[in-house]
Amino acid sequence: MKRGGQPEHYSIRTASVFLGIQIQCAQCHKHPFDRWTKADFDSFTSFFRVSRMATLKGEDARGVRNDYHKVSVYLGPSERFAGKVKSTPPKILGGPLVPYVEGGQDPRIVLWEWMRSPDNPTFARSIVNRIWGHHLGVGIVEPLDDFNQAVPPSNPALLNWLAKDFMAH
């Protein structure tokens, strides 16, 4: 996957890096070892269908390293394909559909707010597992980016305690 890829790439990468969830199998069929379905994949990918890569220019590009001149830009609701393409409403993995976003707000902000919410331990568990794995050579869940029903944490109580402490600070 490369920067500037398709929305599906952003969906797969975001789930893996920030949530420790592998959903790429669900792009075509139900995940063989986990609960994720094609509908879950399509709904999660909808968070990323409203953006494209754009190049920073002028004042915006000053002081930015060359390889970071491309950024993701929110396009806003599109009228171009209204009524022509069936769209899937954004849905948080394992969570509810995201209600209509008021005022043209980027739905990725809604996703980010959910990811870092104290009500959602998934992000915190994934991050503390990565930090643990980086410093100690092995994660509490291995591989680091594959929390699933078939691979339980080696020490669930420790993982939960670290995640709660991470969220508190």
Model-derived features: positions:
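Primarily short, surface-exposed interaction patches in extracytoplasmic proteins
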Residues: M1-H169
